[in-house]
Structure formats: structure tokens, C-alpha cells
Amino acid sequence: DSSLKQVSVRYDVAELIIWNCNTNCKVIVQCKGFIGMTDLCIWDDQIILQAECRNMPWSDVIRSQDAFLQSLCKAYPYSSQWDERRLEDGVVVLSVLLTNHIRFRLYCQRIDVATCGEHANSN
């Protein structure tokens, strides 16, 4: 079992701090090149039932039925690039289901994970 302890967003980095009860270890998940987040509701429960990470190439992003990704494509219809970030490089979607049955998603360019003092590993 794991519990969500903290969620923070600093411009283009979202960070989740998770406590893994099985290993008694803190897990830090950093979503870099952060694009956005949906449906976060941690009012009554922070226990994580399921988490999955999916890399989506640009061709999948533009065909996706995901409402957030559809809005993103509408916002950038002629160019999928701004600053140094390129949507053509794809989007990473981290989906987390809590025990209150609310699933929230983070959208970013890269996810790094560090556990128990380890350095972050990119995904």
C-alpha cells in the first residue's frame, strides 16, 4: 500500500511525494515539462489503489479521446511547440486512482522517480 503525502507544482515541474508502507520508503515522482493535471481530489483519502504511466507519441495525442489532451490540441492547433518544449516529442500521462475512486492524471514530457535516497530515474 502507498499513500499520497504531498502534491506540489512549481511552474513546469509537478512533484508527488508518496509513502510506500511495504518498504517504509518515501518515493518522489517528478513530472518535468509539466503540462497540466486533472481531477485531483484528496479531501478525504490519499491511499493509492493503482498508478500507471503511459508514454504517448504525438500521433496518439492528436487522436486521443482524453478530454484534457483534446483541449491541448485545440489550444495549439497550428503548432505543437512553445518555448523549448515540443509536443511532437509526445506526452507522458501518469494516472493515479485513489481509494475514493477518483482518478487524477498528470501530463508532462518526462517522469523521474527516486526512492529512499536514490537518484531520480527517468521514464
What are the residue ranges of the model-derived segments?
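Surface-exposed, interaction-prone regions used to assemble/regulate multi-protein complexes
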Residues: D1-N123
